Amino acid sequence: RMYNGAYSARDHGVSLAFVTSNEIYWQVRFERDNEGRARRVIVGYKDFKPDPVRNRALRTILWRDLGRPEQELSGVQLPTNGFLDWGGLPFVPIHTHTWPFKGTGLRSGVAVPGELVGYEIDSFDPTYPAPNAVWRVLIGASPFVNFEGDSGYTHNMSIYRARSGALVWATGSMDWSWTLAPGGSSDGAHNNVRPSLQRLTENVLGRMLAGGRR
């Protein structure tokens, strides 16, 4: 119902901002607690033990395996093993001619240094459906090597306008908040605040608050 509610909000014109990553991965369910009270325990078997429930509407399974890939809503999704051991990576903007970059001074392909993309990192996967959008663009493409040393991964930031008029923005980075306010770094000692990325965030949220029409 939560996932359906997010879809419904978007389809009724409510803009959505995913200012993190890996927000929608597993279908989980609620069960009774040891005292018999309903909907008190969140259940997610993941890979540790087979889920005894076979009903796909209740089974704890990846949304994409249910035919409802996360990127159909947010625009990006976590690739298999798409995360780092620790820290973060520079952010590489693309399509900087588009309105989210107004006043940022950023240029396509020129990396913004710092621990800005991490540690769970989303991508757009062309083997799954894209959002049902009237306008869609990826505005970040940062290559990375995952925690196992595998290359070939790329972080993506996505923004699109749904047919309802809603804007949907996904940073694709668990650490995006580090770019916005002091105190965010892997060692607690470095400053990852970037005025250019604060401005990008302001541009997107400002247009959402203006009804997507500014």
Label every PLM stretch briefly.
Residues Q27-R32, G36-N81:
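E1/E1-like adenylate-forming module used to activate ubiquitin-like modifiers
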